[in-house]
């Protein structure tokens, strides 16, 4: 069967986001996730966010990104993963807005638009574990 351009486009965009999220996390684990978390706490020290919340978020963020990245890459639980990724982007945007890093907020908004597109066009998620193994269309 010839791969349709629509299915190919969806696959490539989903893979791009999956690889992106996976490789946001992997270098942090290689360097030590605690270092990333501690840097986050320091970076947010001048914001009204409580340090214990930043500490907790910084502790789990790399794991969440890795899980989202892997699930997007293989196309498993794609809809739920995209919702989780969108919620994560909202949380990141709140923190980044407190830091007033508007260039980063703009980048996070672009991620959110991409996740919107992936959710909106999910009927094109043909090449995925969801469809192949679980019979989802």
Regions inferred by a protein language model and the residue ranges of each:
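Peri-membrane helix termini and adjoining interfacial loops of integral membrane proteins
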Residues: 34-44
């Amino acid at each position: 069967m010839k791969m349709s351009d629509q299915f190919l486009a969806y696959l490539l965009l989903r893979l791009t986001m999956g690889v992106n999220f996976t490789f946001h996390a992997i270098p942090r684990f290689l360097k030590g996730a605690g270092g990333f978390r501690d840097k986050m706490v320091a970076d947010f020290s001048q914001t009204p966010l409580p340090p214990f919340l930043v500490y907790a978020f910084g502790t789990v963020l790399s794991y969440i990104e890795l899980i989202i990245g892997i699930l997007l890459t293989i196309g498993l639980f794609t809809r739920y993963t995209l919702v989780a990724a969108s919620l994560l982007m909202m949380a990141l945007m709140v923190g980044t807005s407190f830091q007033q890093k508007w260039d980063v907020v703009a980048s996070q908004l672009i991620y959110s638009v991409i996740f919107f597109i992936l959710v909106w066009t999910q009927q094109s998620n043909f090449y995925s574990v969801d469809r192949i193994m679980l019979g989802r269309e």
